[in-house]
C-alpha cells in the first residue's frame, strides 16, 4: 500500500510519518511503526526540552482483517513553567488513550448498538475492562461538550439500584428528552447534589420540575432551586390512586371470602388496568362487577373520575374540579380515599402548577425500560459508577465520539 494512503487511513500527519510495517501472519497482527521528524518542540511561549522518548502503542481499526497496532516513540517534554513532564500530543489519538481516535469512534458505535459490554468486547476483540474505559471516556468527553443553556423544564425521579432499598436520583431534560445526571441515593442531600450538578446560572434558569410527592424530592428542590415551580407528576398521582383502589379491594375481598363470596377473586387486573387493555370477555365481566354495590366499585369510580382533573382548561377550573372530587371522596365512607383526598389537598398548589407547565415525568418513566435492559444485560452492576456511566452513555444524548 502507498505510504501516503496508509497515513491517511491511520490519521497520521506531519511531523509524523509511517516508517515501516510488520506483519505477523500467525498472530494476525499488523504493527505500523511511526516515526517523528521533528527535533524541537515549542508551546505558545517558549521552546520545550525533550526529557526523553517513550514507546507507545495504540489499537487501530483492523487492516486486512488483522488486529492493527500503531507504534511510535513519543517525546516526553519538560514544561519549564510547571517543572513537569508531559507526553507530546499525537494526531491519531487523544491524550492518555490506548486507542486511536478512529478505533475509539468505532468502538463507541459498536457499544451503542450492542447495549452489552460482553457483546461489545467480543465484537471489538477487546477485554471487558478496555470496553468499560472506552465507555467512561466517551461519557466524560460528552459531558465536557454538552451545553445546558436551553434547559428550562426538568423531571426528577428515583430508580432502584441494587436489590433492596438502594436508589439513585435521576434528572431529565423534559424538552430535550435526555438524562442530565444521576447521583447515588435519593434523600434530600442527594437531591440537592443532583441539582448542583447544573451550573448555578443554569440551575437558576430552570422554570419548573416534575416529580412525585416524596418529601426528599420536594425539600431538595426548594433548597437548591427555590425559583423552580414544583409540578406533581400525574403518573405518580395515578399510582397513588391505584394503590388506594387496591387496598380497598384487598380488604373487601378478605371480608367477602370469609362469607364464601368469591366475587372479587382474580379481578385485581380489572380494577388497576385501563379499560382499553381488557379483552371483550374481561370487559363484559368488569361491567357486571361495577354494577354491584361494592366498596371497590366506588373506589374505582373515584379513581377514574380524578383522571378528568388533568384535562381541565386551566388552574381555576382545575381547582373547582378538585374541590368537587374531594367532597365526593370525603363522603365516600372509604377511609383510604378520605385519607388520600386530605393528603392531595395539602399538595394542591403543586397539582395546580400542572396547568401552567403541562409537564409530566412520562419521559423518566420511559427511560425505565432502557435502564432495566441495561441492568439485565449487565446482570447487575458492581458499582454505582458503572451504573451511572451506562445510563449517561445510552440516555443522555451526548456527543460521545472523538473529534477526528
Predicted regions and their residues:
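Short, conserved DNA-binding cores of transcription-related domains
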Residues: 1-90
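Acidic/histidine-rich catalytic cores and adjacent linkers
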Residues: 36, 163-166, 173-174, 184, ...
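Short, positively charged, Gly/Tyr-enriched micro-motifs
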Residues: 53-165, 204, 210, 223, ...
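Glycine-rich phosphate-binding "P-loop"
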Residues: 90-98, 174-189
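Short, polar/flexible loop-turn hinges at active-site or ligand-entry regions and domain interfaces
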Residues: 92-95, 204, 228, 252-257
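The DNA-recognition helices of helix-turn-helix-type DNA-binding domains
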Residues: 127, 138-142, 213, 228, ...
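Short alpha-helix plus adjacent loop in nuclease-associated cores
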Residues: 237-258
Amino acid at each position: 500500500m502507498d505510504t501516503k494512503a496508509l497515513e491517511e487511513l491511520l490519521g497520521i500527519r506531519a511531523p509524523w510519518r509511517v516508517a515501516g510495517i510488520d506483519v505477523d501472519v500467525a498472530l494476525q497482527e499488523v504493527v505500523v511503526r511511526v516515526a517523528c521528524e521533528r527535533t524541537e518542540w515549542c508551546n505558545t511561549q517558549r521552546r520545550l526540552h525533550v526529557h526523553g522518548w517513550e514507546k507507545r502503542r495504540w489499537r487501530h481499526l483492523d487492516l486486512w482483517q488483522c488486529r492493527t497496532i500503531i507504534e511510535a516513540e513519543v517525546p516526553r517534554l519538560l514544561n519549564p513553567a510547571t517543572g513537569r513532564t508531559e507526553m507530546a500530543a499525537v494526531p491519531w489519538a487523544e491524550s492518555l488513550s490506548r486507542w486511536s481516535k478512529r478505533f475509539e469512534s468505532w468502538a463507541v458505535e459498536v457499544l451503542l448498538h450492542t447495549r452489552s459490554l460482553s457483546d461489545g468486547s467480543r465484537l471489538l476483540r477487546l477485554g471487558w475492562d478496555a470496553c468499560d474505559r472506552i465507555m467512561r471516556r466517551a461519557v466524560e468527553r460528552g459531558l465536557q461538550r454538552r451545553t445546558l443553556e436551553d434547559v428550562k423544564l426538568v423531571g426528577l425521579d428515583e430508580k432502584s439500584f441494587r436489590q433492596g432499598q438502594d436508589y439513585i436520583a435521576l434528572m431529565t431534560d423534559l424538552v430535550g428528552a435526555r438524562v442530565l445526571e444521576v447521583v447515588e441515593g435519593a434523600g434530600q442531600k442527594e437531591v440537592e447534589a443532583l441539582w448542583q450538578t447544573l451550573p448555578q446560572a443554569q440551575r437558576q434558569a430552570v422554570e419548573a420540575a416534575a416529580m412525585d410527592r416524596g418529601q426528599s424530592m420536594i425539600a431538595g428542590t426548594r433548597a437548591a432551586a427555590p425559583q423552580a415551580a414544583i409540578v406533581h407528576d400525574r403518573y405518580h398521582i395515578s399510582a397513588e390512586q391505584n394503590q388506594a383502589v387496591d387496598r380497598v379491594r384487598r380488604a373487601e375481598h378478605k371480608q367477602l371470602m370469609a362469607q364464601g363470596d368469591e366475587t372479587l377473586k382474580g379481578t385485581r387486573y380489572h380494577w388497576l388496568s385501563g379499560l382499553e387493555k381488557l379483552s371483550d370477555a374481561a370487559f363484559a365481566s368488569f361491567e357486571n362487577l361495577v354494577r354491584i354495590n361494592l366498596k371497590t366499585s366506588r373506589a374505582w369510580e373515584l379513581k377514574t373520575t380524578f383522571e378528568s382533573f388533568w384535562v381541565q382548561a386551566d388552574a381555576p377550573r382545575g381547582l373547582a374540579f378538585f374541590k368537587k372530587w374531594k367532597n365526593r371522596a370525603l363522603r365516600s365512607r372509604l377511609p383510604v380515599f378520605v385519607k388520600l383526598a386530605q393528603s392531595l389537598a395539602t399538595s394542591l398548589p403543586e397539582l395546580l402548577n400542572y396547568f401552567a407547565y403541562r409537564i409530566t415525568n412520562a419521559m423518566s418513566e420511559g427511560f425505565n425500560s432502557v435502564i432495566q435492559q441495561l441492568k439485565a444485560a449487565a446482570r447487575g452492576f458492581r458499582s454505582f459508577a458503572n451504573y451511572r456511566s451506562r445510563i449517561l452513555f445510552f440516555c443522555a444524548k451526548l456527543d460521545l465520539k472523538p473529534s477526528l
